[in-house]
Structure formats: structure tokens, C-alpha cells
């Protein structure tokens, strides 16, 4: 078994694994490590973990050292450089009349690369912009176009629940969220009700989906033909949490409320999005 630690390079970023070697590493410590982008400084987010080495396709790199006072000074200088680079890049974008919005700038610890994150509605030819930035900063320049979900994660904000965005508070990685989840959970398919500030489906739709899927396995769906104590009918409404169904009776069109355990399913239905729903919700899925 290999002893590892987990390191984050952003406050709510993905966790990467490293070998602590002989260092006494604690939660929250700053460590210097080598990554695909070069030498970086990250914060320890996991400690005292042991994992089978065969789970890793590549050898686990060891940390270079615990961050020193001089390393922390370097980080402060890099933060200031990022602020200056942001202002200069905005000026260059305006000068080139490019239709793009600068979101964030990141300077690698070894000062070997500047990364500029931006959003744009379409593809942008930024080759001349890269040349200008390289001439100013004399280092490698990388421009990276991000989606609206990543933009929300970087900028932060408050959701309709009044809480800080999940993505900028604790979600290390985005999970796929689909309109089918909202449909299965019986939520209103009004886009303003189920989409976040980013304009995509709210990440929290994913949190209870497993529980709803388990309930759906044992509950008739809307449109199912069932047999009740009063006769046959069609399920018009389902409350998965209470286990109660509204059933329209065949014999007199009356609607009765029954418990799912008190009926017999003759023919079940499936949950489908109709054409109008698909059209209205187009664009809510994706990045």
C-alpha cells in the first residue's frame, strides 16, 4: 500500500495525489510539487491515506518540499502579477476588438506560464493577442476558453437558495445533470425554477437523484393503469415522497387519492419529455 496525500491548487478545485515521502504533512499545509504545468504550490486537502499502487496508471510523484517563507513571498508576488496581467489583458482585448470576456488569470508558481481564462459566444482568433501578451510578460502564454459553469465557479455568487454556489463552495468537479432528473423528481420544468445563475441546470438536482431513482422502481408512474379497491383507473399524479397517487377512475371519472401499496399495477408507464418540454428546456444541459 502506498501512503499518499491529496493536494488542491484552487480553493474548491480537483484533488491530485502525491507521495508525502518523509515529510510530516498536515491538513492545510502548503506544499511545492511538480505537475504537468510545471512546479506548483498547493494546499493539502487529504492526509494519511493508503491506496493500492496498482490503482494508478502512472507513478505517484513525491512532493518537492513543504512551502518555505520565501515560497510564500513568491506566491504573493505571483498574485500581484495576476492582477496586473488581468488589467493589461483587458486593455489588449479592447485594442484588438475581440468579443471575449476575461474571467481570471493564473500564474504558475515557477513563473513559467500565465493562463488567461475567458468566455466567448463563439470561437475567437486570439493569436495576435497571445503575441502581444508574450511580448509584455516574456513568458509562456495560454488562453483557455471556459464554459458558463466554470465561469460561475471562478467568480462565485449566491444561488436562489440564498447560499453560495455549490460549485464555488465544495464541488471539486462538475457532475452531469439532465432534464430527465428534474422530470423524475416531479419538479416544475420552468427553466427559471431549475436553472442556476450560470443558465444551466442546477447542480443540486444530482444530490437526491439516487433516492428518487430507488423510489421510482417501486412506484407506478403517471399514465400507468392500476387497479384500486374502487376499480380500474389511470395514475394522474404521483408524490414519490409520500407514496400517494391521484388516480382517475374509469367508471365515473372521479379522482381518488390512494397509497401505492394499496393498488395493483396492470400496465406501467414510462417518464418521457414531450416535444414542447424539450423545446422549452433546450440549452439547459451541457457545460
Model region roles, listed by residue range:
Residues 257-287:
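Intrinsically disordered, low-complexity linker and terminal regions at domain boundaries
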Amino acid at each position: 500500500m502506498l501512503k499518499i496525500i491529496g493536494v488542491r491548487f484552487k480553493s474548491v478545485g480537483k484533488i491530485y495525489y502525491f507521495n508525502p515521502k518523509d515529510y510530516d504533512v498536515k491538513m492545510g499545509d502548503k506544499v511545492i510539487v511538480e505537475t504537468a504545468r510545471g512546479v506548483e504550490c498547493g494546499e493539502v486537502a487529504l492526509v494519511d491515506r493508503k491506496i493500492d499502487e496498482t490503482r494508478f496508471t502512472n507513478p505517484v510523484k513525491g512532493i518537492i518540499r513543504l512551502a518555505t517563507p520565501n515560497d510564500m513571498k513568491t506566491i504573493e508576488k505571483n498574485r500581484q502579477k495576476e492582477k496586473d496581467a488581468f488589467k493589461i489583458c483587458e486593455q489588449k482585448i479592447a485594442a484588438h476588438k475581440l468579443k471575449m470576456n476575461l474571467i481570471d488569470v493564473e500564474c504558475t508558481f515557477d513563473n513559467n506560464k500565465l493562463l488567461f481564462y475567458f468566455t466567448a459566444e463563439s470561437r475567437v482568433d486570439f493569436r495576435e493577442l497571445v503575441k502581444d501578451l508574450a511580448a509584455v510578460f516574456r513568458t509562456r502564454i495560454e488562453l483557455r476558453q471556459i464554459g458558463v459553469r466554470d465561469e460561475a465557479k471562478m467568480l462565485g455568487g449566491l444561488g436562489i437558495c440564498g447560499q453560495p454556489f455549490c460549485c464555488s463552495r465544495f464541488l471539486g468537479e462538475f457532475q452531469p445533470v439532465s432534464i430527465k432528473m428534474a422530470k423524475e423528481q416531479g419538479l416544475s420544468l420552468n427553466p427559471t425554477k431549475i436553472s442556476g445563475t450560470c443558465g444551466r441546470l442546477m447542480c443540486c438536482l444530482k444530490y437526491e437523484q439516487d433516492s428518487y431513482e430507488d423510489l421510482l422502481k417501486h412506484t407506478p408512474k403517471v399514465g400507468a393503469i392500476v387497479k384500486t379497491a374502487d376499480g380500474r383507473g389511470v395514475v394522474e399524479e404521483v408524490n414519490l415522497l409520500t407514496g400517494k397517487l391521484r388516480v382517475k377512475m374509469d367508471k365515473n371519472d372521479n379522482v381518488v387519492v390512494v397509497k401505492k401499496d394499496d393498488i395493483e399495477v396492470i400496465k406501467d408507464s414510462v417518464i418521457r419529455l414531450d416535444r414542447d418540454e424539450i423545446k422549452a428546456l433546450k440549452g439547459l444541459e451541457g457545460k
